[in-house]
Amino acid sequence: MKFLRISSLSLFLLSTITMGAMAQINQLDPPVMGWSSWNTYRIHINEALIKKQADAMVSQGLKEAGYLYVNVDDGFFGWRDENGKLQTHPERFPNGLKCVADYIHSKGLKAGIYSDAGSNTCGSIWDKDPNGVGVGLYGHEKQDADLFFNEWGFDFIKIDYCGAGQSLALEEQKRYTEIRQAIDAVCNRNISLNICRWAFPGTWAKDLARSWRISADITPKWESIKYIIGKNLYLSAYAGGGHYNDMDMLEIGRGLKPEEEEVHFGMWCIMSSPLLIGCDLTTIPKSSLELLKNRELIALNQDPLGLQAYVVQHKNGGYVLTKDMEQKRGKVRAVAFYNPSDTICSFSIPTTQLELGGKIKVRDLIKRQSVGTVTNKLVYELPPHSVKILRLEAEQRLEPTHYEAEWAYLPCYNDLATHPRNILYAPLKDASGGMIVRYLGGQAENYAEWNEVYSEKGGRYKLHISYVPGADRKLEVEVNGKKNDTKRSTNR
């Protein structure tokens, strides 16, 4: 078995055919599961409310299902004393937050807290909370980290960026690095950090955080769910190794239609997003609660490989996504048929395109039932705003025959509009997967990389690259650190 890493420098790139393989990943931190206060309560939280939600996590069976974090979001701030030490809100949390964290821990759960990379919190801006002014981490990094994690005992922190963007002229990578270093300097525990910059911040985030937001805030509306899924469709290369693209807190139990809730939860699971419930757990509808406790979907999210599903087909307005489960390059894969459109969508995909062969057992993870076997292709017709998520167990695992540009890791990519020449993933009708990568090249580090290119036996392979530049371009191809012949290529 061989595994190779292929890097390519170009300006426009569609797909490649090559070889390689991969190793197993062990003992990764899975995506965070729990509850957070922001979606339902915003800044209007208090000690009794947080404790009541912790109680409900246990009594509703959510702890048993794997939800462990109870996160106190914005709204607990009071002021800073003459020494700069944070004080909690005198009415909302008159006893401080240590007793809240202790109570959460007494339930066998973990406790999360919130702050901002700048001076002011998001609540001070959007909810006009005067207590959110001057209480952010800026200028108090070590002091607040010591308070949050050593004195109060919290285990997780979400760090927003509202105050940082208010005139401080801070740079995201530098700012979050300073905060991570401050936390590590004062706390010897492994603190889970979430970067909340409302867009994919850059490949540097994986070195600092367990997860990072990739979109604007979620709302309990279908258009919001659809928008966020769309933002994450082509970010699979950046998730893995115990670090994840965060699609924001869940809106299950807050008014979506049942089929839309299935899309919401199912796609969050197959894309390995953190699962932080955002509704009132004491009044959650029974159907929503049962969906959140679907152990087969949870297992998909918490799979030990820690992979995010990627798009293998985009036709008729629908998407097919897949990822390995249980074992890399094994015979078990998860597949999602996702219809975001407002009309019925027909799907048909050869099993070879999913790299599976022979007789394939099919299990519906939403319905939690086996639905027979297939051999050649999967064919479904889905209503609007719906998803079908399957576990496929095949007799054979087939070698891939091509790699799409949109599956590649782009070291310079971010969604903050600060990358070289606006490097981005862009739709193109005639592209093999319907997408291209634009504006590669121009500097040595601006390349596309396929880290886990697979061939069972290895050997010599002919590499074909499809691309659509507006003029001739020079391509450099590197395989496992060895540069291949470089030629000036013509448009294909």
Language-model features and meaning:
Residues W268-M271, L276-G278, H314-L356, H385, ...:
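Carbohydrate-binding surface patches
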Residues H140, K174, V186, N190-D280:
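Glycan-recognition surfaces
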Residues L276-S341, P420-V437, G441:
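Glycan-recognition and catalytic regions of carbohydrate-active enzymes
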Residues Q27, P31-S37, G66-D73, K110-S115, ...:
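Structural recognition of the beta-strand scaffold that forms the well-ordered cores
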